[in-house]
Amino acid sequence: MALNQFSRTQLLLGQESMDLLANATVAVFGIGGVGGYTVEALARSGVGHFVLVDDDKVCLTNINRQIIATRSSVGKYKVDVMKERILDINPKAEVEVYKCFYNAVPCVSDFFLYLPENADDFDFSKYSYVVDAVDTVTAKIEIIMRAKACNVPVISCMGAGNKLDPTKFRVADIYKTNMCPLAKVMRREMKKRGVKKLKVVYSEEKSLRPLEDMSISCRTNCICPPGAARKCTERRDIPGSVAFVPSVAGLILAGEVIKDLSGVRERRQLQ
């Protein structure tokens, strides 16, 4: 085996798996506290092609938990910062970025309750795997349903805010989740749409109540970059977060993607 930056990974996965990862295209929606760590792990595992979707710019308040957030990156688009990190890790990787929020508007279709205004920008059939790391229910539903319609594997992250125990994260089918308020909503929405199964990462920890109300100071003294979309001032609730919780969720997501794409689960008989 020739030594390269992925040699240690190859020792566990094998050359065949590394080739599969190098040829895979993973679309990650949401490059924040969860999605940023997912992309980081995928890049360090040898995934060769990325589609990154996020309209947000790095904010000072992201520094406590987001891998892309540093003093020098504040004000820059998250997808641009993430692309730079990927290419610094693996110059051979191909990275496509979309500086937009995968938003939705009402639609009369029987299959889709929501239709994104930018739907034509995304051809899900070209993706090897889809990662949903957004925090908006309508966008999550649309991402999942479009992946399902194209028979593309998809994994979705449930709530990671207002939690302190990273050991409570689990991988399960959406219908076997408990405790998570977001998962409860998604169970109902997936059942309504006839979705039989959906792999998710969720936490069994009961959501904690923030000790202080940040919304007041954030609404009057917003430190987001001028003109940034979806400022904190426009959010109804601002969840508390710590570095060691959303990061773990993101790494678990990446682990599932790697094991599914590489085929190592079957060869190693992993559960």
What are these regions (language model features)?
Residues 1-27:
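N-terminal charged helix/coil linker that caps or initiates catalytic domains
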Residues 47-90:
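Glycine-rich phosphate-binding loop and adjoining beta1-alpha1-beta2 segment
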